[in-house]
Amino acid sequence: MFRAAIGIVAFACATSSQFALADEDNGSSRRIEEVVVTAEKVESTVSDTSISITAIGEEMLEDLGIQNANEFVNYIPATTRDAYDIRIRGVGRNFRSLGGDPGVATYYNGIYSEDALIALTENGLFDVERIEVLRGPQGTLYGRNSIGGAINYITKGPTDTFTGMFRGQLGSRYNQEGYMVLSGPISDTVGYRLTMSDRDREGVQRGQYGTPDANGTNDTNTSLAIRWNPNDRSEMNLRINKRNSSRDIGAGTILSEGWGDFRGTRRTDVFAFGIRPVTATTAGAYGFTDPDTGVVAYGAPVRPGVDIAPQSPNPGFAGRGYLNGNGDSDFDDVTEEALTNGYNDEGFDQMGAQMTFSYDLGEDLTVKYLLGYGDFQYTYHFDYDQTDAPISDLGVSVLEDVWNVSHEVQFLWNPSPDFSLTSGLYYFQSDRLQDYRLRNATAQGRYTNAADYALWDAPNPYLGGITAMSTLYASIPWLAGPHCEIDTAPVGGACAGRWGGDPEGATYKHNNTNDTTQTAAFAQGTYNFNDQWALTLGVRWAEDRKSVLENRFYYFEFNLVPYIRGTVLDPLAATYGILTDPSTLTDLAFANVMMGAATATGDAESPITPTCALTAVECANPLRLNGGMPFSGGTKAVDEKTWSAVTGRINLDWTPNDDTLVYLSTTTGYRAGGYGLGILEARVETPQGTKPVSYDEEEVLHIELGYKATLLDGQLQLNSAVYTYQYDGYQDSVDIYDPSQDAFREIPTNTGSAVNSGFELEGTWLATDNLTLNANYSYTQTEYQDDVYLLEDDNPERPIQLFGEKRFNLKGGALKGIPTNKFTAWGNYVWDFETTRLTLLAAYSYTGEYNGSALERDFDKIPERTRTDLSLIWETQDRRRRARFFVDNVFDEVNFRGIGSGSHLTNYKLTGTLLDMRRFGVDVTVNFGG
């Protein structure tokens, strides 16, 4: 594939001269207007920049109605998005933890921003001059977290004369958006630009059975830009914004659930999820055939309180058997709807500032100082069980508080026409706090109320009047401990104690911090040997230091029965008239009897009767499902590490004529190591105590051959590139096999070497004076190169309770999140009248299927998707009045951004994140002044 792609570029180079010399009359007198970019810290055009870069200008953003991340990535080759991050050529963030970093750097007016989606959602991309997307490692000039590329958002600045704009949008689902701009001079040396936006839309996911709608918009933002030119040699640009968002966050889409004949249905008749091994003659038995070996085994639903199951009841129990769609694997009947208990709230309060001051020290030397500041709080309360049933209500609450500041000094030196040098120093500091809670405020009160240990705490005559629990205090002292809260554990240690209840019903909490500092120094110079050949060399040294704290609290169930079987258990059971035969009364069932949650029946198939009905909303002694006895636990871990690297760039340019550029580039990239904060198993014991698991830096070697040409006398533009990446220490979060424990653990780790190769092609053709056509295509192939073993526990056709754990070796498989094929085409046709203009636009995008997890399986692949948009624009010739009528996703395609699969713990639930379905509306703009 790689050699074939090189051949394509070589063919294009060989034929470019013929195209350039061709005097073909295609009926067009227009010429392609170059977009000026600052990809290499100095102004140049896309065609003159030896980087794979796509620049989306203001006109394209407005004409195509690009207003969010989902629409934006459709127009960029080899680019997709995750929940909070962007992937370029598959490089992104494979796991979301507080101690990790993104793989694509986000810049706002040339200054680093911590969160990609802050920039991609501000103002609905209104008042943006252009967006530059740089593909491939940008480790020399951009540095921090740009191992996959960089995205730079350039906003509009103050104008020399007074101008203004009002813009309003009305659309389906009561979408209402208002925008305003006022810009002009304050004095001869100072100018301003004030931009305001207010966006509001009701939830597009229709609440089912009278429940609230989800996925709405309620967003306001105000920004002020100031430009100051104190003299001819200096300029300062400052932009400050304040933003607030409070909305109903989108709910997950439940696509399927269940196993066996119940696959594609929602089980509301079982109190606890899980499968137990049984014989073929057991009531309710279902036969499974191992797809690998052909072995047949039988399973049946677990018996609540008898067989080990997840600690929370089935959230759909005694509720509605709701699925979005018909449960099929084609998802054709899925639509925008949700079923929740009504709390899907998201809040976002953000302030940012970017300041650039430049001073010309001479004709050939300019110094720049760049200051960046960001501060935001992000909160959400999310019902993630996709049901409104009253027995169990699973939810998550998050508060994330982020502060960051950056300083950069750049020196731009041009001592001669043949040589230029950009160098600088960089400092970045970030403090992140994340408060995270998993909760279930119903669940019959099992989490909100303090546990009643009943017979475990009752004085027993056989034991001389002491309690059964106290017989184990010497060997398990924490059994007597008080309720352990989130800040109880010592640093590097743990605490455990009785369950005292949590007012919110929290089963897990963490309060984590990550303080990050990066310092860097860089330089990149270009030497022109002659009019055709130029060499660029760049180097960057960077050091990252992370200091982390993870403070956890959790609910867990522990079974004491195995510790007292025999000499203590039998007489104890006899005292209370409890049978002890383990074939009749399992350890879990016995524990529930001792907890006062059940009574023994003597029936081997149904050995206990719950004290409270399973449908009871409240219960003083609820049936325990996992270990039988509830306790509280907590840990506190701290650590600090430093990573550093030297990265570089070597680039050779060949410019055979003014319209052609061929470049060969070798670049290295680096992403710092980090920690798996918030990942339950990501802990390690050391002589200094418990510490969070860390992972090493990720490095990449990137080689790219590019070709850019303007042909047909300025009416056709082609940009292409063929590339390969070689990763070392590829970062991911996987279930890996730990030989020392003979078990699988989910931890963040470096999975070794991986390769990623592909090619891209972008083109613009001014076909006639009225017709413009654009297209891009990308092809990507990826492969794990080292042995990485993963556990599969979420395949409903092969339950691990029946067939045991199955290990997969990822070696030779594809990396996740990367479509092999991606294609977009768009065009417009213009009718010019004396005072007005009418433009018809159409856009089509295709993204091929790709892996949603590290395992290559059909049932959780992200399906291929297509989208077609149409719009009609009426405007005056001076563009002072404008109306755009649009229909997005014309054919109402069902498209997904993500697919997630659960294990037996969630009854193999399959969920998806649905992209926008059909939308329509009108967008009106009025300009004044100038």
Predicted regions span which residues?
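C-terminal beta-signal and adjacent terminal beta-strands/loops
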Residues: 442-445, 726, 770, 834, ...
